[in-house]
Amino acid sequence: MHALNLQPKTITLAERLADLAVDALIDEADLSPKPALVDRRGNGAHTDLHLGLMHASALALWPAFKEMAEAALEFGEIGLPLREAIGRIGREGEQAMLATTHGVNTHRGAIWALGLLVTAAALDTKSTSAGAVTLRAARLALLDDRYAPRPLSHGAQVAQRYGARGAREEAQLGFPSVVQRGLPQLKRSRAAGHGEQNARLDALLAIMTDLADTCVLYRAGEQGLHAMQHGARAVLDAGGSASLTGRRRLHELDQQLIALNASPGGAADLLAASLLLDRIERDGILQGAF
């Protein structure tokens, strides 16, 4: 009788980064209670989304994230060839997402944000702090993909109308909502002993306090954005999601945003980006990949 071989299979760096990106998307989807977003309780302000669809969409994006990391390793430097390669891969990933979800846009913004971060992380595994990775991602985002389709997304239309910073500008600036809001709040809440789920909720709320979320602007206009930002600040000012008063404020915010049809999908994408960077930075997870 042969002993079972329990040695874990060695995975490549690209595979590991793709795993982390998918994990971040699933962790974001599972996090509950999120205001007006799909979570374990229900569909939030959405009629076309549910948790199982979010999971399936995230898993469908694994090949695209892996190929982006492989492209970074192949090209080895920030430049137009790499930018256009990951742009093509991202568009292919979007088609895989839409095939899985039967045409529902679950993660278009996340493909952009997490794809850039996966690529940036793969470019230099010896420099994986959040600041270093987001700086490389910003340099990539600033390059113009000549093959990108030009029709304006909903987010881009709203960004033009309201003068808001869209997903492209967020990346080109080095993800300030992540580096200055999400990650610091995640670390503060952990240090205060609030527990991982509450720390992640607080990180989402911190992003929401300042983000001109184009998903909210598209669905609910400036009234919805004001409600999101001020409501998120009220939760944090009340002690965050780990406090009784903060939980009450969070419930109130959830109900208010649902009534306004204001779902902060941009903030959710940036929370997923925060969770990805946190895992890369905190656990040194890239060290064991080959």
Swiss-Prot record:
Keywords tagged on the record: ATP-binding, Nucleotide-binding, Transferase
GO molecular function: ATP binding; triphosphoribosyl-dephospho-CoA synthase activity
Catalysed conversion reaction: 3'-dephospho-CoA + ATP = 2'-(5''-triphospho-alpha-D-ribosyl)-3'-dephospho-CoA + adenine
Transmembrane region(s): none
One GO term (biological process): prosthetic group biosynthetic process
Keyword S-adenosyl-L-methionine: no
Presence of keyword Repeat: no
E.C. number(s) listed in UniProt: 2.4.2.52
Pfam families: CitG (PF01874)
InterPro entries, A to Z: CitG, TriPribosyl-deP-CoA_syn
Function (record text): Involved in the formation of 2-(5''-phosphoribosyl)-3'-dephosphocoenzyme-A, the prosthetic group of the acyl-carrier protein of the malonate decarboxylase.
Family note: Belongs to the CitG/MdcB family.
Listed name of the protein: Probable 2-(5''-triphosphoribosyl)-3'-dephosphocoenzyme-A synthase
Organism: Pseudomonas fluorescens (strain Pf0-1)
Lineage: Bacteria, Pseudomonadati, Pseudomonadota, Gammaproteobacteria, Pseudomonadales
Encoding gene, per UniProt annotation: mdcB
